[in-house]
């Protein structure tokens, strides 16, 4: 089964680093903005509540967060079954912008599950004014209520590879809850 998901959020929040960490690639310390969209694949076995173990192939679309690419993004949402919506816990603007990103996702992909990710937790204690876990939970609830979609919250560190697998596993579970058995086997 192929599952298309999108990695969305402002530029510089760590979307590409999350994808690379999930694929077990080396962390890139130098920031290189994504141009348009990057694409990754990964085949894994996941546990679906009603089906047991199932093999899936993630098709991970890593969207550029730069405003310049806003006009072309809608085309890339087509067929998405879920989103990893990322903000940087040390960047309040990226946190606030998650509402805009969630709206864009729901408008273009429909009411699909979203995992809100507070990335760069390795910066807590090193950078002033980091957002808290409670802030992330509040935003997840806000997005869920505003757009009537299933939203969970996970904190990650792409640098330290903390909770990267958990974010994708949570998204898979949420997607399977929404899909019918017919959709899974088509």
Which residues does each predicted region cover?
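Conserved glycine(s) of the Walker
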Residues: 14
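ATP-binding glycine-rich phosphate-binding loop
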Residues: 35-36
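Post-Walker A helix-loop "phosphate-sensing" segment adjacent to the P-loop in P-loop NTPases
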Residues: 24-32
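Ras-like small GTPase catalytic G-domain
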Residues: 1-8, 17-25, 41-186
